[in-house]
Regions:
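Hydrophobic ligand-binding cavity/cleft-lining segments
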Residues: 8-118, 254
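Hydrophobic-cavity lipid-handling domains and compact docking modules
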Residues: 100-161, 167
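Beta-strand/loop substructures that line and gate deep hydrophobic ligand-binding cavities in soluble
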Residues: 136-202
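Terminal single-pass membrane anchor helices
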Residues: 227-254
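Amphipathic alpha-helical interaction motifs in eukaryotic regulatory proteins
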Residues: 67, 71, 166, 208-219, ...
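Phosphoinositide-driven peripheral membrane association surfaces
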Residues: 1
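A conserved amphipathic terminal alpha-helix motif
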Residues: 186-230
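Beta-rich interaction modules in large eukaryotic scaffold/regulatory proteins
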Residues: 36, 176-178, 233-234
């Protein structure tokens, strides 16, 4: 009976831990159930066709904290919507994260974006599928797949983007003390056009600029959150010290 109770207790603890993680990530399954990728190097999880990172930034937070602040369900109508408006996008809509058979989780984003081009429409409808997967080593991969419905040759290609969020550790005790986020893009052509090189160059330039703006905004949000936590902890310590002082010397500190 003791062994059975111990096993049941272990199962309950595991369920609770999964529920805590689910609060941060939506209905995320156990990490162990997600498909593994061969190779220990995190870069192996970014296919070769994506090439080198266009943008890279380090953060004083874990990959989970980065996700929660910028990409979680709770961040959709705050950080994510703010970034959409700042980019000039309208008619923004976003579903919640749902389980995906291969990528872990996915959601659909729709919006109307301005077009920076001398010819064609001034704006276009965009449909974007986002995915994410968290690996056992805390490496987080967030993927975007976007098509633009109203631009010339819009049905010829899709823009495939990946955010690679790799945890950083201190030397010696190997304690996680931050993460590095790199941004990779691949223009996937479904049909041939003689304008492929022009389209690819334009996409890389625009997505790099957007990624830089996104990461700078993410850093501001995370820094503000960190400062708020530090301030709250400092106030709590001061209050506790004053309470101890008051009790010891019978001093009224109110």
């Amino acid at each position: 009976k003791e062994e059975e109770e111990t096993e049941k207790g272990g199962e309950k603890r595991e369920e609770v831990e999964n529920e805590i993680e689910a609060d941060d990530y939506g209905e995320r399954p156990s990490i162990q159930k997600l498909p593994e990728v061969e190779g220990k190097d995190e870069s192996a999880r970014i296919p070769d066709e994506y090439g080198k990172a266009l943008v890279s930034e380090k953060f004083d937070c874990t990959p989970k904290e980065f996700f929660k602040a910028c990409c979680s369900n709770s961040a959709t109508n705050t950080f994510f919507l703010t970034q959409s408006k700042a980019s000039g996008q309208t008619n923004f809509s976003c579903t919640e994260w749902a389980k995906h058979s291969h990528y872990g989780f996915s959601r659909d984003v729709k919006f109307v974006a301005p077009v920076n081009s001398t010819f064609g429409p001034k704006e276009t409808r965009c449909v974007q599928t986002q995915t994410y997967k968290l690996y056992p080593d805390d490496n987080l991969i967030i993927g975007y797949s976007q098509v633009q419905l109203d631009i010339p040759y819009g049905d010829y290609f899709s823009v495939e983007s990946k955010w690679n969020c790799v945890p950083l550790f201190t030397e010696g005790d190997r304690k996680m003390n931050g993460c590095e986020v790199t941004f990779h893009v691949h223009v996937l052509f479904e049909k041939y056009t003689y304008l492929q090189s022009v389209i690819q160059s334009s996409v890389l330039s625009e997505t790099k600029e957007s990624a830089e703006v996104f990461l700078n905004a993410a850093k501001d949000v995370l820094n503000n959150s960190s400062n708020s936590k530090s301030s709250a902890m400092s106030e709590e310590k001061s209050a506790t010290f004053l309470e101890r002082l008051s009790k010891r010397f019978s001093i009224d500190v109110t």
